[in-house]
Curated annotation (Swiss-Prot):
Name of the protein: Mastoparan MP
TM regions (residue ranges): none
Pfam families (UniProt xref): Mastoparan_2
Role this protein plays: Antimicrobial peptide. Has activity against both Gram-positive and -negative bacteria (B.subtilis (MIC=9 uM), E.coli (MIC=65 uM)). Shows mast cell degranulation activity (EC(50)=15-26 uM). Has low hemolytic activity (IC(50)=100 uM). Its mast cell degranulation activity may be related to the activation of G-protein coupled receptors in mast cells as well as interaction with other proteins located in cell endosomal membranes in the mast cells.
Compartments reported by the entry: Secreted; Target cell membrane
Keywords carried by this UniProt record: Amidation, G-protein coupled receptor impairing toxin, Mast cell degranulation, Membrane, Secreted, Target cell membrane, Target membrane, Toxin
Thylakoid in keyword set: no
Keyword Membrane carried by entry: yes
Length: 14
């Protein structure tokens, strides 16, 4: 799992 990509996606969702 790519945490950097996942974190960025979650940040964009907020």
């Amino acid at each position: 799992i790519n945490w950097l990509k996942l974190g960025k996606k979650m940040m964009s969702a907020l």
